[in-house]
Amino acid sequence: MSLPKFLACAVCGNQQEYEPFVPAICKSCGSQWLEAQYDYAAFKREILRGLPGRQFNLWRYQDILPLQNPASLDLYPAGGTPLWLSQRFAPPLGNKNVYIKDERYGPTSSFKDRQAAVAVAAMLEGGVKEAVIASTGNAAVAYAAACARAGIKLWVFMTSLVPQEKLREAA
């Protein structure tokens, strides 16, 4: 579990408890500029202890994701996409180590699968049964897939400019 230790106001320095699904507003000055403060030493210990033997996807890093008990959820399998060494772009950039992350191998072929997976897992933990998203395409498709797996009803709002194939994928 990696919930913030506390929230710190960037305006007045006030520290307050983190409360999931509650708007982060400073209780001292009313600022909306609060930064989550984490125990990074604990993250390091958990990462080093827990990675070997875990599945190769986003949930490999469950100890540092903002979830209480991800092991208890039927999780959307995001992440774990290949990283390719680029023979084409490395020379012009003057660096022999240029890699390209290939998200085509994810559930909806978008890097937005990762955010959707974590957000929907948090919704499950919070007891959310229905959600809304406004999107121009990829986010709606990723959230639609993750919410469908989780049994969360999703309302999707898109403009008429969104390509038909994205509308079909999100439906």
Where are these regions (language model features)?
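PLP-dependent amino-acid enzyme catalytic core
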Residues: 1-171
